[in-house]
Amino acid sequence: MAARIAGVNIPVQKHARIALQAIYGIGNSRALEICKEAKIDPATKVKDLSEAELDALRTEVGKFSVEGDLRRERSMDIKRKMDLGTYEGIRHRRGLPLRGQRTRSNARTRKGKRKPIRS
């Protein structure tokens, strides 16, 4: 029995709180909030939930922007900033850190592999 919520197969062997976190956009606090609203014990394993309880979880998860919709929203926000030419948009375009971190000696992950200086 595979439990599908928001188009994602959630792991049935795990507790409801942990299993919900397999959905993009749901972290620990939101998973606890969803369990509370659906009146489900977060420590209950997904395989032990009834179909009615799974439907309650689906309803609660449906109230949030998750998975594809959330990914699309985030990419559109970044694209909008780039089109407007904001500081953040420029940093995104150049592939540099956005939030004031130093780049002279760090930021290797964001900048990528070192490029040799051509003379």
Curated annotation (Swiss-Prot):
<dbReference type="GO" id="GO:0015935">
    <property type="term" value="C:small ribosomal subunit"/>
</dbReference>
<comment type="function">
    <text>Located at the top of the head of the 30S subunit, it contacts several helices of the 16S rRNA. In the 70S ribosome it contacts the 23S rRNA (bridge B1a) and protein L5 of the 50S subunit (bridge B1b), connecting the 2 subunits; these bridges are implicated in subunit movement. Contacts the tRNAs in the A and P-sites.</text>
</comment>
<dbReference type="InterPro" id="IPR027437">
    <property type="entry name" value="Rbsml_uS13_C"/>
</dbReference>
<keyword id="KW-0687">Ribonucleoprotein</keyword>
<feature type="region of interest" description="Disordered">
    <location>
        <begin position="90"/>
        <end position="119"/>
    </location>
</feature>
<keyword id="KW-0820">tRNA-binding</keyword>
<dbReference type="GO" id="GO:0006412">
    <property type="term" value="P:translation"/>
</dbReference>
<dbReference type="Pfam" id="PF00416">
    <property type="entry name" value="Ribosomal_S13"/>
</dbReference>
<keyword id="KW-0699">rRNA-binding</keyword>
<comment type="subunit">
    <text>Part of the 30S ribosomal subunit. Forms a loose heterodimer with protein S19. Forms two bridges to the 50S subunit in the 70S ribosome.</text>
</comment>
<dbReference type="InterPro" id="IPR019980">
    <property type="entry name" value="Ribosomal_uS13_bac-type"/>
</dbReference>
<dbReference type="GO" id="GO:0019843">
    <property type="term" value="F:rRNA binding"/>
</dbReference>
<dbReference type="InterPro" id="IPR018269">
    <property type="entry name" value="Ribosomal_uS13_CS"/>
</dbReference>
<comment type="similarity">
    <text>Belongs to the universal ribosomal protein uS13 family.</text>
</comment>
<dbReference type="InterPro" id="IPR010979">
    <property type="entry name" value="Ribosomal_uS13-like_H2TH"/>
</dbReference>
<dbReference type="GO" id="GO:0005829">
    <property type="term" value="C:cytosol"/>
</dbReference>
<dbReference type="GO" id="GO:0003735">
    <property type="term" value="F:structural constituent of ribosome"/>
</dbReference>
<keyword id="KW-0689">Ribosomal protein</keyword>
<dbReference type="GO" id="GO:0000049">
    <property type="term" value="F:tRNA binding"/>
</dbReference>
<feature type="compositionally biased region" description="Basic residues">
    <location>
        <begin position="91"/>
        <end position="119"/>
    </location>
</feature>
<protein>
    <recommendedName>
        <fullName>Small ribosomal subunit protein uS13</fullName>
    </recommendedName>
</protein>
<keyword id="KW-0694">RNA-binding</keyword>
<dbReference type="InterPro" id="IPR001892">
    <property type="entry name" value="Ribosomal_uS13"/>
</dbReference>
